[in-house]
């Protein structure tokens, strides 16, 4: 690795440590030419699949959109942050674990609905109202009836 101070090509690793979360390696390096030390970080490059929107155009996966969807649906709901993070992590693992290079936004939306249903029924209904484009009160009432009719369990799948 090139020294950031003198530009020399030859540096040596003095110390390596794995970060607390285990996702990065911190390396202390020393330049063999000027003797100065510097730190580098090594991380895994993760490539999420392209998202195919309903209109057919393709966009890069945006992790922030996923977080925002959960935040809006769960706004002022009594759901611990750790549970929300775990739900988002499950969706990210599905995205990476499937090995697909492309995935439809509809599939991701369904995964979000499944996770919200497990976390909080009100948040599920909020998200469903936007995701399914509810047009009147009847649409809300129908989903509420479906939610009320299904047994309550952490492993529930959303109705319909």
UniProtKB/Swiss-Prot annotation:
Q: Name one GO biological process term.
A: negative regulation of DNA-templated transcription
What are the ATP-cone domain coordinates in residue numbering?
A: 49-139
**Keywords assigned by UniProt, alphabetized:** ATP-binding, DNA-binding, Metal-binding, Nucleotide-binding, Repressor, Transcription, Transcription regulation, Zinc, Zinc-finger
| Pfam families hit by this protein | ATP-cone, Zn_ribbon_NrdR
One Gene Ontology term of the molecular function aspect: ATP binding
Where are zinc fingers of the kind unnamed found along the chain? Answer: 3-34
What is the required cofactor set for this protein? Zn(2+)
Note the SS bond partners.
none
Q: How is the cofactor bound?
A: Binds 1 zinc ion.
In terms of InterPro entries, this protein maps to:
ATP-cone_dom, NrdR-like_N, RNR_NrdR-like
Q: Which family does it belong to?
A: Belongs to the NrdR family.
**Which HAMAP family does this UniProt record tie to the protein?**
NrdR (MF_00440)
- What does this protein's UniProt record list under function? Negatively regulates transcription of bacterial ribonucleotide reductase nrd genes and operons by binding to NrdR-boxes.
Protein name in UniProt: Transcriptional repressor NrdR
Species whose genome carries this gene? Nitrosomonas eutropha (strain DSM 101675 / C91 / Nm57)
